[in-house]
Amino acid sequence: MCGIFAYMNYRVPRTRKEIFETLIKGLQRLEYRGYDSAGVAIDGNNNEVKERHIQLVKKRGNVKALDEELYKQDSMDLKVEFETHFGIAHTRWATHGVPSAVNSHPQRSDKGNEFVVIHNGIITNYKDLRKFLESKGYEFESETDTETIAKLIKYVFDNRETEDITFSTLVERVIQQLEGAFALVFKSIHYPGEAVATRRGSPLLIGVRSKYKLSTEQIPVLYRTRNIENVKNICKTRMKRLDSSTCLHAVGNKAVEFFFASDASAIIEHTNRVIFLEDDDIAAVADGKLSIHRVKRLASDDPSRAIQTLQMELQQIMKGNFSAFMQKEIFEQPESVFNTMRGRVNFETNTVLLGGLKDHLKEIRRCRRLIVIGCGTSYHAAVATRQVLEELTELPVMVELASDFLDRNTPVFRDDVCFFISQSGETADTLLALRYCKDRRALTVGVTNTVGSSISRETDCGVHINAGPEIGVASTKAYTSQFISLVMFGLMMSEDRISLQNRRREIIHGLKSLPELIKEVLSLDEKIHDLALELYTQRSLLVMGRGYNYATCLEGALKIKEITYMHSEGILAGELKHGPLALIDKQMPVIMVIMKDPCFAKCQNALQQVTARQGRPIILCSKDDTESSKFAYKTIELPHTVDCLQGILSVIPLQLLSFHLAVLRGYDVDFPRNLAKSVTVE
């Protein structure tokens, strides 16, 4: 729930001001991950070794507040130039300790700032570690679990058995004592110009930039043979020495820059050449050379880490002419759904091929059950497509919230196929559910929007939804692309079913026209803004539908809750008389989603019950629906498409409505309170 960014310039002269600007810009790209406090750690001296110390600047509030605070530091000369320097930065979303400067990161080992660390994740055994360290005389100043890590590395250093112990060895010994999830980056006055980063269960990648030739495209992974099992024996092992053949560097020991980040969006403006770290990797940079090592060797370990090229451009993560990322992403949906289908759906032959699944297709077709697992919006995408998946695959389909799935210890078998849906590919509960299913030998399929994410790497196969970067905390275009990806899976599974060919052609024809129909829906933006003017002072809002559009109600209500802070509830129209009808009166705003599909007559029945109780329904309906409009307070008429795809068109007005409501209520659309984009802790 936090954003990590760090920058090393090796033999690349940079002023302190330029270093600040790089760090702040990196944090701004990551602000969607958390924004209740932020901080940086840089060299505080004026490039004289004898004055070496680390300067911490931390501020409660967003990254802009930190940026302003940096330039108030009279003790720091912004013009001083560093040929080699390592700076770390962090934007926080609180999990341990209230938002405050003292609880924000970087956390320090002592008042002399000998070691500082930035952290994303949760350390579950921090209380035991803190108790041990306090017994050794270490004093704590914050309420965070992260401070325990900073104090622990100081303890290891203070009790080192030799003066020439390496920075990476210290970190290796520390992480063997940590339980939970973490991505960590360390800086120390004892190791100037060096960086160490590591991860377990939380994303971390490293970008590399140099105008000179790099020594390798594959960084070999180094191993230690001995393990540390007890914190009391933490200072009794050493790591083998490195040489240039085991490291990544610029040939000739020339200039190179390294960028460490939780997310590629913070790196892409600097370089598209990145290394994705795996769980328990320890990456160290010293003298401009990057090495990677691990404590244990497993049979399944990849012997190296490849430099990968990101297929992302800076303009994709900028707002452009829109006032908010969420608004931009809503209006990108004609392109994002087209990109999801591009190269996969052949509209001439009515065939669908998902390249990431083709090697496992026979195994998937032999399964006895599909389990689709997600959280929040990703769960709603599963609900939206459950019916069409059951129809096309002729298999039972279970749709599960990841946290509940784990709480119940749900039975999973080897002949199950389990789908894991996550925009970021790092959602903690979904990732834990994936590992639960892998332990039970089920085939696992990832549906993500992030190449190199934990879910995309750990699943047996997968589908990249290709929606492009999504920065706004409230998911919009990822939902519609997840929706289409699951429909495409159903179409691929049913390709040889003769009885389903007419239905398949109907759905594929609907997919072809979808981008243009979405543009038509987006043209209703002004009308939806006018509706928001009537509703923004309300305290509650009901969204009602059934069949294919029940998921639309859940997702629309979630969007309204997320960014407007209005109470909103998605209601299955079939359950109206089992409780929700008691809420209906002339004061309660009700949005009803009624489309020309098999549930149309039943939805009409629910509509009449609402109007009979003096309700004033706002109806999302098909253009040719004259019947629903007779009972409507207001209507928003939408283009018609095949029933199983109608939910893509009907959810967009609710996305727009939530956006306009939030703006009218004076809230920050992209950064709703108490929420973060990537939920990487349970």
Swiss-Prot record:
Gene Ontology biological-process annotations: fructose 6-phosphate metabolic process; protein N-linked glycosylation; UDP-N-acetylglucosamine biosynthetic process; UDP-N-acetylglucosamine metabolic process
Domain of life: Eukaryota
Residues that coordinate or bind substrate: 377-378, 422-424, 427, 578
Annotated positions of the Phosphoserine modification: 244
Catalytic activity: D-fructose 6-phosphate + L-glutamine = D-glucosamine 6-phosphate + L-glutamate
InterPro entries: GATase_2_dom, GFAT, GFAT_N, GlmS/AgaS_SIS, GlmS/FrlB_SIS, Ntn_hydrolases_N, SIS_dom, SIS_dom_sf
Pathway(s) annotated for this protein in UniProt: Nucleotide-sugar biosynthesis; UDP-N-acetyl-alpha-D-glucosamine biosynthesis; alpha-D-glucosamine 6-phosphate from D-fructose 6-phosphate: step 1/1
Record keywords: Aminotransferase, Glutamine amidotransferase, Phosphoprotein, Repeat, Transferase
UniProt domain Glutamine amidotransferase type-2: residue ranges: 2-288
Domain SIS: 360-499, 531-672
A Gene Ontology molecular function term of the record: glutamine-fructose-6-phosphate transaminase (isomerizing) activity
Keyword Phosphoprotein set for record: yes
Entry-linked Pfam families: GATase_6 (PF13522), SIS (PF01380)
EC number, UniProt record: 2.6.1.16
Active-site positions on this chain: 2 (for gatase activity)
PANTHER family: GLUCOSAMINE--FRUCTOSE-6-PHOSPHATE AMINOTRANSFERASE, ISOMERIZING (PTHR10937), GLUTAMINE--FRUCTOSE-6-PHOSPHATE AMINOTRANSFERASE [ISOMERIZING] 2 (PTHR10937:SF10)
General function of this protein: Controls the flux of glucose into the hexosamine pathway. Most likely involved in regulating the availability of precursors for N- and O-linked glycosylation of proteins.
Alphabetized NCBIfam families for the sequence: glmS, PRK00331.1
Protein name: Glutamine--fructose-6-phosphate aminotransferase [isomerizing] 2
Native organism: Bos taurus
